[in-house]
Amino acid sequence: MGGSCAQRRRAGPRQVLFPLLLPLFYPTLSEPIRYSIPEELAKGSVVGNLAKDLGLSVLDVSARKLRVSAEKLHFSVDAESGDLLVKNRIDREQICKERRRCELQLEAVVENPLNIFHVIVVIEDVNDHAPQFDKKEIHLEIFESASAGTRLSLDPATDPDININSIKDYKINSNPYFSLMVRVNSDGGKYPELSLEKLLDREEQRSHSLILTALDGGDPPRSATAHIEISVKDTNDNPPVFSRDEYRISLSENLPPGSPVLQVTATDQDEGVNAEINYYFRSTAQSTKHMFSLDEKTGMIKNNQSFDFEDVERYTMEVEAKDGGGLSTQCKVIIEILDENDNSPEIIITSLSDQILENSPPGMVVALFKTRDLDFGGNGEVRCNIETDIPFKIYSSSNNYYKLVTDGALDREQTPEYNVTIVATDRGKPPLSSSRSITLYVADINDNAPVFDQTSYVVHVAENNPPGASIAQVSASDPDLGLNGHISYSIVASDLEPLAVSSYVSVSAQSGVVFAQRAFDHEQLRAFALTLQARDHGSPTLSANVSLRVLVGDRNDNAPRVLYPALGPDGSAFFDMVPRSAEPGYLVTKVVAVDADSGHNAWLSYHVLQASEPGLFSLGLRTGEVRTARALGDRDAARQRLLVAVRDGGQPPLSATATLHLVFADNLQEILPDLSDRPVLSDPQAELQFYLVVALALISVLFLLAVILAIALRLRRSLSPATWDCFHPGLCVKSGPVVPPNYSEGTLPYSYNLCIAHTGTKEFNFLKCSVPLHSNEDMVCSVSPGALIPPHGGEDLTSHPETLTSQAPPNTDWRFSQAQRPGTSGSQNGDDTGTWPNNQFDTEMLQAMILASASEAADGSSTLGGGAGTMGLSARYGPQFTLQHVPDYRQNVYIPGSNATLTNAAGKRDGKAPAGGNGNKKKSGKKEKK
């Protein structure tokens, strides 16, 4: 394949491939398809049915993408019919200039499979140009002595049309002195000349005017005219004579402009003015006059422009030598241009694939191109080659047409595009070459799965993070392009509950950012694992998974919680009893606290914030153990209070406080009075609520009393006097062994008085007797449930009727004397009957109270947890404290039927006055405050 661009180093395989590829190129090796059309054909005119001439059906036109290509595209193919249509204006004179034969070469390209067919369109000339004279006014001179038959040369007209449409004839208007003769030269050109018919007489007529008309051979013919003015001069009988009738010279096309080409010379045997010769171009094409210049005096011809053998191979001109007397003669000059290897080969891409799939098999055609060299002979023979380290190679089809095909596997991820440089070199000396680079883009297929940046991810997230905050980001890459490389992220697995994953975390499908959907709690969830998936959008889709472990870090968000000492169910505080004889270092109690945090945030330390007696107790910094720092002194109070702070090790640290109530006593009996008289801090808001409730209760009680009084009065009127006989002494008294003789059965009128303190505990006032009783009076039964009747006569009942319906004021002091106070078991004075129960009742009552306290503390309903009248006992005092710890309890017991509170012995030691008899009873704590 002489002009092949194939790579010579692979000659062996190509000898095998050539017979296989020959059928593929066979259509391009056949004779070209020829069409002939006239120039100036209208746009859209049909040149011929190209599809039919190629043997293609109408369906193949669009299916195989039939099209034509050329340097200057004057034609197009109808996509429906396959007709070859005129696309642009076709002017033969502009396209082919002075060439006699005008042809346009096209390449018809079809695909599936890819083939090329040669098409030649011959452009026929039409008479679209009229003849034209260079000068509309022609001035000639002739001597009157000129003999008949003397000829005067005229400038010919020019017509760019050829053949029959070129200039056919000349004519002039009739004149007795001149006639027109047409001279035909060797190349068929026609040149007009005037011939003198008879002698001139200058004295008779000094000038002659003629009209010269040039006609072409078109149908209808076109014409042009020029005015000839002939002046008659005196005689000049010797015309100039050239040294040669024809000058011929060969010039290299590389001759620079302005170089001397040829000098013509003529001689005249006349003398004087008649011997002075001037040189002019005659009967020369306008393009030739532009290419050359002629010195009128010397006859030197020079080139004005560079020669180009590929455009014009030969120039022909006529040079006229005219003497001063008007006689002239002509010679012919022929200049031939010699071809030089001055044109580099051209590479013209006729078809190029936009993209090549990276899985394309070897041998796939990706581009079609051709080469052209305007030089002739060996200077115009071209061979092509490309680089050897790329997976492409070149096959030559025919007539300098080539195919660029794949020659190996393609991988877009390694090489997304190839810059293929085609080098064309001619066989001139020296050889010239040119190159053309084309870029081939490799189209992507989804052949790569996403790859994560890390094999696994571990992130640390502090608890209490804001919901919606980003806690991590995973990133995957996919070297594919477009949708094949577009990655979406999702959560596919987790060690959390399947339905709870979305409530804990979410992942952005676009960025891979993992967001927390809620605030994490280290104490509930310390770590969890996710499996994230990166999936591309290719077809089929490819994916990859990665594990993400989230470690929830601890924050100091939980304050220490004190387990001991704890408050009772009703809010009362426990007391710890310390023996009075406790030595320094004695373990009194231990503050127990926990912290839900971990690490340093849960490292607790204990500190004393406030102590009623500083220096009496010590507190373990880490253990929380409360020990005595020294022995109890005589001046130290029996009741001590410690305010302990428990701090954790977080930053900033959190703390909790606990209040320890410590009582120095050797037995429970000593601390019972203190438990009853604990001060209770007052709250202004609670006091306001208390007063409101008391006021409401008083109004209700007054209303109830009014209703009861009205009912009692109505019943009193309706009952007979015999009914009241029951109130006589002894009528209703029941005696028997059940009740000791000190007591009588009866009913006491009572009322409830409810007080609410800020601690939330409720205080119940015991029953209040409506009639004041003396310690030496017995109780008798009355039919009316409203009063207790003293044993007097009937006149007392009638004289004091208000005692039945009203409540007497309480005694100013219900304290017992020292003789009346009960002692230890078995020490009761037998003379004070009717005041205290016997010792058996005393023992059973205390045991029942302690057991009830322990039982109620266990189920959260204790009434002995420190409220009013409960002695401040709690569950922890129940089981371990028995009667042996309480030798005497009666000094702290409220006496039913009295508004006064029996003060304890400590109250007397403090010298406090007894409560007044106004009927308003306060809690012991409030009395101390006021």
UniProtKB/Swiss-Prot annotation:
* Record has Zinc as a keyword: no
Residue ranges of domain Cadherin in the record: 31-133, 134-242, 243-347, 348-452, 453-562, 570-675
Q: Which GO terms describe its molecular function?
A: calcium ion binding
State the signal peptide span. Answer: 1-30
Key words, A-Z: Calcium, Cell adhesion, Cell membrane, Glycoprotein, Membrane, Repeat, Signal, Transmembrane, Transmembrane helix
Q: Name one GO biological process term.
A: cell adhesion
* Predominant place of localization: membrane
What CDD domains does the annotation carry? Cadherin_repeat (cd11304)
Where is carbohydrate linked to this protein? N304, N419, N545
In Pfam terms, one family for this protein is Cadherin_tail
Query: What's the stated role of this polypeptide?
Result: Potential calcium-dependent cell-adhesion protein. May be involved in the establishment and maintenance of specific neuronal connections in the brain.
Protein name from the UniProt record: Protocadherin gamma-B6
